[in-house]
Amino acid sequence: MAENIVVFEIPYACPQSQPDHDLMLALATVFNREQEHLGTAALSEATPEEFSACLNPSPDSVVKHRIFVALKASALAEDASGVDPTTGAASKAPKLGVADDASRDRSTASNASANSNTAPVLPHEVRVRDVVGYASLMYWDQPEAKQGYLSVFTDVDYRRQGIGSALHEAAANRARTLGLSIVEGWVVAISDRITPPQREAAVHLPNGDSFPMVPELAATMSWGYELGNVEYMNALHFPMTEDAIAILTARAAEMPSNFQVYSWLDADYPPELADPAKFMESFLRLRSYANEEIPAGELSVENHSHTLASWEALVERDVRAGKQLLNAAICDESGQVVALSTAQRQARPEGVFHQDTTLVAPSARGQKLGWALKAALHKLIVSTCDQPRAILTWNAVSNKSMLHINESIGFHPFLLEGVVQLRL
């Protein structure tokens, strides 16, 4: 890595001071420049509030983030003694490289070694142009959780300098100290290469799927990752056509009458529920199996569970980030949730939604419940958003049935993504 770049970990639960806001803005800028490079800026944009919310979860949250930043060494306004060389004043800036939440998660053992008097310190003012990359590690703070999710972003003007490798090394080392054994990441093929390759240089999976050997995939493989799955990022632009709405409405109407559909925003549960806590217990129980039910190719899969408190903490975090969660669920005659779907209205760009989970229990499949979920979410979107622009969803290339359903109502592939995993 270039000698003029410093990589360190942002303090967990960092104070909400102005320098921290500027740093969050810088991280969002790196992400957004990457979206411009990929041609996805109209559909995906980060905000400073999103990063701040991730670093400051509520006590009940089990979803945690660690963020590592690559900063120009010239931006360090203070020397190792903690004195500003330009003013001679003692530093009041928080030290970086210190995970200072030993009482809040399982990283206690690693905090002592990270806490050093010689750790670099955050400048009083972080300029956007001084941040040249970051890595984000998301994980579940539960003893049984062994899998994390790691993303690395290097500013488009600072590639091929080893910055991404240094960021990845720092984040992977943190994952090890947290007791994780696998990290998962994503690489993207830009929109003009969306068709999975057949004969060109590519990595091929046993199921026949393949992903082009783009530089990002080559880099992750050099770090030890293996390609495990290939997905389409699909986009549906609003308004839906009359034909698409007719198809959606007709298919949803075929759901048997003994099922009941519910929909709600954030944690404002449907008022017609007699026992919201019992309903959500059933909802979260089904959701905990989502990962193993989704076509995963060669990936190692880990399910994650929520209590009602931890789920509401996750919703509250996203609300602080300016987002909104749209929920749809279907109950059978016994009151058990047998199908669910969630989508998230993004803070930016306005009117863009990300659909992250759709699941129908095996016992209830083949009865058009999936169509009913899509119809319920569509109704929520158009009734709560004045100008909806698009909804995005991610589907494995091998999931032909879901891709066909989505295509029939107007979704089209926008990006090709390779899902990779590293065993630590």
Language model: regions and residue ranges:
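Acyl-donor-binding surface of acyltransferase catalytic domains
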Residues: 1-13, 168-275, 417-421
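Short amphipathic alpha-helix that is part of the acyltransferase structural core
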Residues: 1-88, 92-106, 113, 117-130, ...
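A conserved beta-strand-loop-helix scaffold within acyl/acetyltransferase catalytic domains
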Residues: 38-64, 72-74, 134-144, 291-352, ...
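General structural concept
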Residues: 132-139, 147-151, 166
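Conserved hydrophobic beta-strand within the GNAT/NAT acetyltransferase core sheet
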Residues: 150, 183-187, 355, 391-393
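A short, internal acetyl-CoA/4′-phosphopantetheine-binding micro-motif in the GNAT/acyltransferase core
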Residues: 151-159, 189, 357-366
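Conserved acetyl-CoA-binding loop-helix of GNAT-fold acetyltransferases
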Residues: 160-176, 360, 366-379
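Short hairpin/turn module used for nucleic-acid contact or packing/dimerization
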Residues: 362-424
